[in-house]
Amino acid sequence: MAVGLLSAGIIGVSSCDYLDQKPENLKTTDMIWETRVEAEAYLYNIYGYIWLSTDDPVVFGFADETSCVFSNTNVRNMVEGNWGPSNTLGDNKWSAAYRGIQKALVFEQNIDRVPEGVLSTDLKTQYKAESRFLRGWFYWNLLRLYGPFVIFEKPAEQDEDFNNYVRRPFDECVEYVCGLMESTLNVLPDVWTSTAYLGRPTRGAALAVISQARLL
């Protein structure tokens, strides 16, 4: 009886040790900033929060130029009065924009941790400018879609009380967008010479956002 219990205990301990093992390929946050590939992948992920202008192909139905016959579009939600906090224009672009902003802030806060021999100072400067442009772009679209927004200067913590954050005055929001864009003008090129950078922001794109924001 004693031998049987001892054997069962040994088997149980062995099973626990086997199940408690950590996957060898499990990535940590620190590992992101150890290699160029991982750091660049993090930046590219921020670009993924940019939504397409064709997200809702029947936007004409928002006005009176035409009627929308599709039943599963955002247009129907508006004209039928079915919009709510969790069911908004464009599949809640408010949430998508702030996710992109938070990731951009994390990127800018940590990109300098990548070793110099892995990622040059010039590339770090370029990537930070791209990230600031993306933040400005997200904020600019928040302003256009929803009006004044909440400004984050650093990544938010998960346990923060977000009720303490308030929307800033409209003029302050415009200046904030313009400030982010202006901070990229001496870094972003007029034209990217390599096809590897197609789709990246340019100096002209930043100036275009500034001019549109000033006209609001």
Provide a role label for each language-model segment.
Residues 35, 40-52, 73-146, 162-175, ...:
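Conserved, well-structured interaction surfaces
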Residues 141-142, 148, 152-154, 197-208:
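Aromatic-lined, polymer-binding surfaces characteristic
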Residues 15-61:
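Membrane-proximal, proline-rich intrinsically disordered regions
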Residues 155-159:
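Short edge-strand/loop segments of extracellular domains
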Residues 1-14:
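Sec-dependent bacterial lipoprotein signal peptides
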Residues 57-72, 150, 198-200:
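Short, solvent-exposed turn/loop segments enriched in Gly/Ser/Thr/Pro and often Arg
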